[in-house]
């Protein structure tokens, strides 16, 4: 079984006029691939639990992105499109998607 495991988290404050850019989704922007796996493995998050479960099952994993921003204004359209496309691009051949 091949699982796509990803994290996208943002609390939107619609009253804020300032858009949330891609760079806000992590210390230096989102984590990708092996970095996303390393950051989330063992973390007290749903993505961390999904990774633990996948490893216990012996499942193959794809971790295209881990993106978490602090509460802020509406997500910039280009940032949203990039995050979504990163997940979509990793999906072919996967049996299931676990999204945190």
Segments (PLM) and residue ranges:
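A short alpha-helix capping/helix-coil boundary motif
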Residues: 28-30, 67, 99
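Short beta-strand elements in bilobed, periplasmic/extracellular small-molecule ligand-binding domains
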Residues: 58-66
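N-terminal amphipathic/basic leader segments beginning at the initiator methionine
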Residues: 1-56
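Aromatic-enriched hydrophobic runs in primary sequence
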Residues: 27, 59-60, 91
């Amino acid at each position: 079984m091949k699982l796509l495991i990803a994290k996208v988290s943002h609390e939107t404050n619609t009253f804020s006029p300032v858009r949330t850019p891609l760079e806000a989704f992590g210390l230096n922007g989102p984590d990708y691939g092996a970095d996303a796996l390393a950051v989330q493995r063992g973390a007290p998050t749903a993505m961390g639990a999904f990774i633990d479960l996948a490893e216990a099952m012996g499942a193959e994993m794809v971790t295209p992105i881990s993106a978490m921003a602090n509460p802020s204004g509406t997500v910039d359209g280009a940032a949203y499109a990039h995050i979504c496309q990163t997940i979509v691009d990793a999906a072919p051949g996967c049996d299931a998607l676990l999204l945190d």
